[in-house]
Amino acid sequence: EGYIGRAFDLSRVFEYKWTVNLKFLPEPIFVSKTTAAVLLAGHAGVLALFILTRWLHAQGGGLAGVWLLLRTAPPADAPPLSPYHMVRMLFVSNFIGVVFARTLHYQFYSWYFHTLPFLLWATPLPLVARLAIFAAIEYAFNVFPATTASSGILAAAHTLLFVGLFVGPAEGERLCRHDDCGSRRKLE
């Protein structure tokens, strides 16, 4: 089997004792093929949702934005993607993969830890909420072995960050703190 076949092998079973993110599920549910399929479908669906509603906002959003992106030569008046937007797309897409992972082990924290400050500050959440989310994620990955509570805290923190990223500004609406924001939305 090739990489793609093995990467999406729904018959593979992960060891329940090592999971950090889904320890709040009973083991039979954790190892079920239905759970694996739901997580994979959720991952694909949320990526599509972000593509259609958040990431291609400056290109017109929706399927029109996808069409513009897929064209061989974008029109001269097509707005360029900013470096901020590119980094945000990459970090958010990685985070979506983390949220919908069938299992996260302790070493996976290093896979996305360095993106958390950027992601947290890309949300409209208050400072105290950002710091609480960061502390909750840090706590969850420092409990060994993972417990139902630490896993639930991680899921709650991921959910709050995810919602903050979704309701936050789309490309072309980047939050800024200065009076001269151009087309960007100002922080309240």
Regions found by a protein language model. Name each.
Residues 1-13, 33-188:
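Multi-pass membrane glycosyltransferase architecture that uses lipid-linked
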Residues 13-34:
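Juxtamembrane membrane-water interface segments that cap and precede transmembrane helices
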